Structures are given as structure tokens and as C-alpha cells.
Amino acid sequence: MFYQDPFDVIIIGGGHAGTEAAMAAARMGQQTLLLTHNIDTLGQMSCNPAIGGIGKGHLVKEVDALGGLMAKAIDQAGIQFRILNASKGPAVRATRAQADRVLYRQAVRTALENQPNLMIFQQAVEDLIVENDRVVGAVTQMGLKFRAKAVVLTVGTFLDGKIHIGLDNYSGGRAGDPPSIPLSRRLRELPLRVSRLKTGTPPRIDARTIDFSVLAQQHGDNPMPVFSFMGNASQHPQQVPCYITHTNEKTHDVIRNNLDRSPMYAGVIEGIGPRYCPSIEDKVMRFADRNQHQIFLEPEGLTSNEIYPNGISTSLPFDVQMQIVRSMQGMENAKIVRPGYAIEYDFFDPRDLKPTLESKFIHGLFFAGQINGTTGYEEAAAQGLLAGLNAARLSADKEGWAPARSQAYLGVLVDDLCTLGTKEPYRMFTSRAEYRLMLREDNADLRLTEMGRELGLVDDERWARFNEKLENIERERQRLKSTWVTPSAESADEVNAHLTTPLSREASGEDLLRRPEMTYAQLTSLAAFAPALEDEQAAEQVEIQVKYEGYIARQQDEIEKQLRNENTLLPATLDYRQVSGLSNEVIAKLNDHKPASIGQASRISGVTPAAISILLVWLKKQGMLRRSA
């Protein structure tokens, strides 16, 4: 039977991608249905209890700038906040927060349940309703059918998921949850390329059995950072330390002596695991010269005794896991409360998606999260928001939207996936972006909030706060430009005390701030340039914009040159065998990837600058050279 009311958008899955997709579609005014196998696990942190990090924190800030949920949730649930790379330049600084799993899940669920236009329904999905290559609904486990104009798949590791502990394995979507086998089979019937990936998680330890007195503590930053542009540190719950231990030669001997019982090394697991979050088995074998690896003992929450040992993800048998854990300092008597495991699951080739994350083959069907080959909550959330907003736009008969690589890390993520695909779980790093000086955490709102408002994602409160910040930045920059000090002025001695070389000519506040030794806080502590802005976010922007003005202008020039290639469109139906002068390798790669633009084509491995030149000449001769607005 069909449910009595149709929906505009259906989201299948309530993880980090699904919750952002549902919130985005509903915020845009579309009637949205979120289908999940268990309402109690909405926003569940399946692996590490943390949000953010290098590249990942940038994505969280971008999701927040577009009105998303993740940053607000972690501000309410974070039990330790730190700025990584704090001593480096602003482009690579990143926020990371340890999370209380329960508080995080509660924050997400509360937001979902109070979001207008959103209905949550507990049922596993077993089938899609596809008519004439167009998705029109979904079928649940009990046979109830829902109709919609667009469907977003955010099913994580549940598609034909298989959990491995040693040489034993069983079906599961994650520990304690069933897999989605009927939906996996249905998707394999569609004209989509499917493969298997693998990820893993470490055993969880009972904190009462760890001797923390012999371990180094790691505290959060003070003052505490904040994730959301709308947040403040007063929202953070109680803060707690993490602890550090290390593996040693005894640990490594245990692992080496039991590799024959590892499902990865025994050939039982076929899926490829994450390169940048390897299992402890992989680390010991790949870095054989290392006699120790640092392990962070991270609390799972304020009311939980569970500890997450970050760095010993493993699928070795339980008895070996016990030996590994107890070989480390402070853990000699430790008890495991949940075994570590590896999980294999289906993922679908993201090269079969448009940059909006809609399938090229099934109209109205969108994919987001681990189903696209990514790893990490943050990557999933960013994709979920993009897929949700585009599903909403499609259901309203509007064109899709995707950010450019020069506009957001989300643009880098989607372009990498849709252009290059992936053969291993993809995670975001700042090094993946060509224009990372422009794509900083601190300016995510300046880059994206205006577009978020146009798309219908940004509410009135956020929009008012954003415009107030813009006004504060502009007013303060004008004040510093127009405030001067001369070498002979009474205030010159006070200014010179902060400079490595004294004033030799008249200087404005901006001139002084450009000097590497002068900070905004120091400058505005001087009588001639006081007072400082009360808006800390605006003050940070003033300092960065002034100090890096020349570098930013240079990178903006590079972006404008590259936009010419990005805006030169390639016909979707072009058979590159028609283009004389291209090598067989280039023809095969272009026909396989079907890039949407010259810019995308140039990023495909093996497509040389010479091939791009040949392609441009051929397009011009054929009268097919088109540029987007």
C-alpha cells in the first residue's frame, strides 16, 4: 500500500549524510521524509567520538555556513576543543572536538524533530520505485510505499555489510545493526558501477581498568574554540582531558605473530581500506622501522566509562586484541567492552554522478556519504547537505547547484569524486585544494553564506548576524586605513615598542598590521588605534585580510584564469574517438569519465596539457566550443 501523502524528497538513512540532507531539504520548504531503520540511532557516531581535524574541520565550517547542523551539534556535545596547526598559517589551521556520543546524538535528534516540513519514519527500505529511469519512491520492509519527486541514498556501510573479527564474519551494517541486503541487491540491478570498500574500528576499553596516572594528559585549548559561526563557548559541556600511550615492540610482535589470523592478510577481506586511517596491522607492517606508534585514549562521553583508543583499529581475533591492548603502558590490566572489527560494504562509483550528486542514469536519485566512497562524518555531512539541497531544488523544478573548487572544500570533494572517482575510502585534506589560502575555516561564511541565503538554507537570524559581521569588518578596516601615526608623534614611542624596526615614515593602522611582528590585539591595545572590535570573528578577519592581502589577490588572479577552463563545457554525448590526434589512452579515459568541462578533463590522470590543446582546437573547428555564464 502507498502512504496517504506524497513527499517532495525522501532521505534513506539517518547518519551524518542523511540528517544533513533531511535538514537541508526541509529548510528549503520541501516536504521531506527521513526513513531510518532506528530513530534512536539518528546522528550516531559509529566510529571515533570526534568531529573536525585537518580538512575535515573546514568541511564542518562550510556546512555551518550553509545553515547545516553538524557544527551546532558538536558545540553542544564537545568535551574537548582544540585548534590543530595553531602555530601555522590560517589556511591550514583546523578545529577538532572530542564528542560525548550521547549528547551529540541528542542534539541531532532534537534538531530533526523540531524542523518544520520534516517527517521521520522508522522502517528499513528494501526497494526503490523506478519508472522510465526516474525514481518516484521507496518501499519499506513492511511493504509500505512512499512517493516522492527525489530520493537521496545515505546508507553508510549498511549495503550488504559484512563484519570481520579474525577469520569469523557475519552480516551487519555496523556493530549491533542489521545490514541492508535487499536494497543492495536492488541497486545492483540498476545501471550503476558497484565495488566493495572496507573500514574498521578499534576495541573500546573500560576506563576503570586503565592506569591513567602513568600516562601523559592532553588538554583542550583555553580559551575554547567554537565550531559554529552562530555558537559560543558557553554552550560547551564540561571539558575533559585525553591521554596518550604508545605501542611498543611487544605490541608489534603480537601483531606480526598473528597475521595469519587477520582477515586482511589472509585474503578474506576483498574491499580496500582507508589509506589515511590504517589498521594497527597495516601500520606495523608498512612502517616496520618504527618501534612505537602514538595512541590517544579518548573518552566516549561524560557519563560513559568507555574509552576509544585512537590508533589501534583492528580486525584481529578477540584474544589477539586483548594481547595488543594489554601490551601498552597503563593498559596492563585493561578490559575490552566492545571488540574492534572491520566492515566491508558496497559503494557506487561516484563518476556516475553529476556534481549535484544526482545519478547520471536515474533521474531524481541522489547519493551521499560512504556510498560514494568517502570516509568520515564530515565528508558525509557535506555531501548530505549538497544532495539534500539539490534534491529539494529538483523537486521544485529548479536547476541544481554545486560549489566550484575555488569556492569550497565541498567543491573540491565533489569534483574529485565525480571527475576522478576513488578506489579507496576518500578523506579530505587541505593538500587536496589548489586554492587553500582562499578556503580557510575562518572565512567559510564569507564564501558561502550569501549563496546559502539565495538557496533558502540560511535563516533570518544567521543572515542578520552575517551582515553585522560584514559591516564590522568593513568599518574596522576603514578605521585602520584612516588612522595614522608619524615618527614624531607622541604615540610613536608606544608603537615602536612593538616593532622590530622603528617608524621611519607616517604609517596607517593597516600598514602597521601588515608587519609580521604586529598582531591586531597588540595594535588595538595602543592608545592611537584603540579600541578593538568586540566581535572576535570580525577582528580575526580584519587581521587575516590585511596581513595576507597580497597573497590573496595573487591567488584570486589564478582562480580567474582557471575559471576559463572550468567554464568551457564539454558535450555530455561526445564520443572522444571522433577527436583526431588524441592517444588511445586519453580517448579511453575521457570516454570513461565523461568530464563536464575542460577543467574537469585536465584533472584526469593521464590527460596531458597537449591533449587538452588538441581537444580545444577540435571543439572550435566543430563549432562546439561553449562557455557557461
From Swiss-Prot:
Compartments it resides in: Cytoplasm
Main localisation: cytoplasm
Keywords attached to this entry: Cytoplasm, FAD, Flavoprotein, NAD, tRNA processing
A single Gene Ontology CC term: cytosol
UniProt-annotated binding residues for FAD: 13-18, 125, 180, 370
Positions that bind NAD(+): 273-287
Highest taxon of the lineage: Bacteria
Presence of the UniProt keyword NAD in the record: yes
Segments traversing the membrane: none
A GO MF term: flavin adenine dinucleotide binding
Cofactor(s) listed in the protein's UniProt record: FAD
Gene3D superfamilies, per the entry: FAD/NAD(P)-binding domain, GidA associated domain, C-terminal subdomain, tRNA uridine 5-carboxymethylaminomethyl modification enzyme MnmG/GidA
GO BP annotations, alphabetical order: tRNA methylation; tRNA wobble uridine modification
PANTHER family, A to Z: GLUCOSE INHIBITED DIVISION PROTEIN A, PROTEIN MTO1 HOMOLOG, MITOCHONDRIAL
NCBIfam families assigned to the protein according to its UniProt record, in alphabetical order: mnmG_gidA
UniProt subunit comment: Homodimer. Heterotetramer of two MnmE and two MnmG subunits.
HAMAP family: MnmG_GidA
Function: NAD-binding protein involved in the addition of a carboxymethylaminomethyl (cmnm) group at the wobble position (U34) of certain tRNAs, forming tRNA-cmnm(5)s(2)U34.
Homology family: Belongs to the MnmG family.
Protein name: tRNA uridine 5-carboxymethylaminomethyl modification enzyme MnmG
The organism's taxonomic lineage, starting at the top: Bacteria, Pseudomonadati, Pseudomonadota, Gammaproteobacteria, Enterobacterales
Name of the coding gene: mnmG
